[in-house]
Amino acid sequence: MFSELDDFLDSFLDRGTPGYDLAVFHKGECVYRRFRGYSDYENKIPMNGKERYNLYSCSKVMTATAAMMLWERGLFRLEDKLSDYMPEFSEMKVRDGDGVRAATRPILIEHLFTMTAGFDYEHDAPELVDFRRETGGVCKTRDFAKYIARRPLLFEPGEMWHYSFCHDVLAAFVEVISGERFGEFVRKNIFLPCGMTDSTFYPAEWDHETVAAQYRFNENGVRERISKDIIFYNFGSEYESGGAGCVS
């Protein structure tokens, strides 16, 4: 039944992919599971099906789900102003040529979901360099939003779409509304009910021995191993990135 899928997945190994791991569920039942290759190519450690992976932007699914759970409880409306809950966003600036001007529109909660708030995705922005330095490398999720609010927007909120830190700010919003750490809220309301006991947003819980090595192909098509030191979204010891911070 799945022989063609087997062959397709194996073809990635022939093209230099170190390994793969795929599970297919239907109506709550695992109907397909296959893993091949290496979780650590250099040390020839084979995939065993128990590895954890950096989910990167797939983390956004959990973040949006967590926020919508709070919406279902009637704790906010999508058309509410973000500044009603996070005052640092009350007087935003917008880039205007070589300068900035005052924003004429407020950021709404719905803009965080739809990537239309006007934020950028510059991980090395001066404000975020300050974030790391001024928090001593702790970098709590709620504090992240305060530093992002210092940065001028790319455009008026709701004016256009731009892939950005919207879901990282949404994670901080979840903390404000729920009164809990973002990762803890997700753990109790999503991970545990779904049986995802090996999933976390909290960097201190990352057992790097169980996380598969990461690779990329450079501009010349050569496979390179990614150093843990350049996982750029992990700003600090307590930062839980709603946009890219889930390990599962």
Feature roles, as predicted:
Residues 6-10, 28, 54-80, 170-175:
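Active-site SXXK
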Residues 34, 80, 180:
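Short beta-to-alpha loop/turn elements within the nucleotide-binding domains of ABC transporters
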Residues 17, 75-76, 180, 196:
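Helix N-cap/coil-helix junction residues
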Residues 83-91:
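Acidic helix-start/capping segments at beta-turn-to-alpha-helix junctions
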Residues 2-55, 75, 91-96:
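Short, conserved catalytic-motif segment at the N-terminal edge
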Residues 92-248:
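Short, surface-exposed loop or secondary-structure junction motifs
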